A protein has these predicted regions:
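Conserved beta-strand signature within the Rossmann-like core of class I S-adenosyl-L-methionine
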Residues: 133-141
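A short SAM/SAH-binding and catalytic strip from SAM-dependent methyltransferases
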Residues: 102-117
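Short alpha-helix
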Residues: 151-166, 172
C-alpha cells in the first residue's frame, strides 16, 4: 500500500479538486506542471500517481495522449473525462514497462508517497516504461522543507534511484516555473532521461 493511502486513508477527491478550483479563481496558475512538461517532449505521456487527473487532463488539452495511473480510487474518481486521457486504477510498481511513453510525469509529491522501500523498483519500472530518449519528470518536497510532519525525500536519494534505473540527469529546478536550482531548495523538479539506445 502506498504511503499516500496509509497516511490519508483515501482523500475525498472532490475536496482536493476544490482547493485547486479556489486557487484558479484567485488567479493562481494551477497548471504549472503541465506547462513545464508539455514543452519538453511529446506526445505520449504517463501521469504516474495522477490523483484527480489535474496534470494529465491539462496535458491532454495541450495535445498529449495521456494514461494516468493512481492507487487512490477516491482521487481517481474525480478525474475528468477528457479526450486523449485515460485513467487507470493501479499501483505504480505494476505499471507495464513496455517502452511506450515519451514522458513520465510524477508531479505533486508522488515519489514521497511511494510505499516504503519501493522507490528503487518503482523508478526502475517507470524508466522501462519510457521510450529511448524519453523523459522522467518528478516534483517533490525535499529534505530542506520545513519539518511539519509531512514526508520528504532527499534529492541525493532520488538521484540514486534514477541512476540505478539507468536514467541520466538532464535538469533540476526549485519549482515548476523553471526556477534555478539551489541546494537549499525545499522543492525539487528533476528531469532525467532514458538513453537513446541500449548501452548508451
Amino acid at each position: 500500500m502506498s504511503r499516500w493511502l496509509q497516511e490519508t486513508g483515501g482523500t475525498p477527491g472532490a475536496s482536493y479538486n476544490q482547493a485547486f478550483r479556489d486557487l484558479a479563481e484567485a488567479g493562481v496558475d494551477v497548471h504549472g506542471e503541465a506547462a513545464y512538461v508539455a514543452a519538453l517532449i511529446g506526445p505520449g505521456s504517463l501521469d504516474a500517481g495522477c490523483g484527480t487527473g489535474r496534470v494529465g487532463a491539462e496535458l491532454a488539452r495541450r495535445g498529449h495522449v495521456v494514461v494516468g495511473v493512481d492507487s487512490d480510487p477516491w482521487m481517481l474518481g474525480e478525474a475528468p473525462a477528457v479526450p486523449g486521457a485515460r485513467w487507470v486504477l493501479g499501483d505504480l510498481d505494476a505499471v507495464e514497462d513496455v517502452a511506450a511513453y515519451d514522458l513520465v510525469v510524477a508531479a505533486g509529491n508522488v515519489v514521497v508517497f511511494l510505499a516504503d522501500g519501493t522507490g528503487p523498483s518503482v523508478l526502475a519500472r517507470l524508466a522501462r516504461a519510457l521510450r529511448p530518449g524519453g523523459l522522467l519528470v518528478a516534483g517533490w518536497r525535499t529534505e530542506r522543507a520545513e519539518d511539519d510532519g509531512r514526508p520528504v525525500l532527499a534529492v541525493a536519494e532520488y538521484d540514486a534511484w534514477c541512476a540505478a534505473a539507468g536514467l541520466s540527469p538532464v535538469a533540476r529546478h526549485r519549482g515548476w516555473a523553471g526556477e534555478p536550482w539551489s541546494d537549499d531548495a525545499d522543492w525539487c523538479v528533476a528531469v532525467h532521461q532514458r538513453p537513446d539506445r541500449a548501452g548508451a
